[in-house]
């Protein structure tokens, strides 16, 4: 955690972005499967 004083490491950005993408895709498919995604 000592490297957070400067630029944010790319692996942290990649991990956060990956989690967000997986979460959004999961919510999208879950909503479509349960019928709630039709309003999106």
UniProtKB/Swiss-Prot annotation:
Its main location: plastid. The chain crosses the membrane at residues 8-28. SUPFAM superfamilies: Photosystem II reaction center protein J, PsbJ. It comes from the Eukaryota. GO terms for biological process: photosynthesis. It is a single-pass membrane protein. It holds the Pfam family PsbJ. The keyword Iron does not apply. One of its GO terms (cellular component) is photosystem II reaction center. It is found in: Plastid, Chloroplast thylakoid membrane. Keywords: Chloroplast, Membrane, Photosynthesis, Photosystem II, Plastid, Reaction center, Thylakoid, Transmembrane, Transmembrane helix. The keyword Chloroplast applies. Belongs to the PsbJ family. One of the components of the core complex of photosystem II (PSII). PSII is a light-driven water:plastoquinone oxidoreductase that uses light energy to abstract electrons from H(2)O, generating O(2) and a proton gradient subsequently used for ATP formation. It consists of a core antenna complex that captures photons, and an electron transfer chain that converts photonic excitation into a charge separation. PSII is composed of 1 copy each of membrane proteins PsbA, PsbB, PsbC, PsbD, PsbE, PsbF, PsbH, PsbI, PsbJ, PsbK, PsbL, PsbM, PsbT, PsbX, PsbY, PsbZ, Psb30/Ycf12, at least 3 peripheral proteins of the oxygen-evolving complex and a large number of cofactors. It forms dimeric complexes. This is Photosystem II reaction center protein J. It comes from Helianthus annuus.
């Amino acid at each position: 955690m000592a490297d957070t004083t400067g630029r944010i490491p790319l692996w942290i950005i990649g991990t956060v972005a990956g989690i967000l993408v997986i979460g959004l895709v999961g919510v999208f498919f879950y909503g479509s499967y349960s019928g709630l995604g039709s309003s999106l």
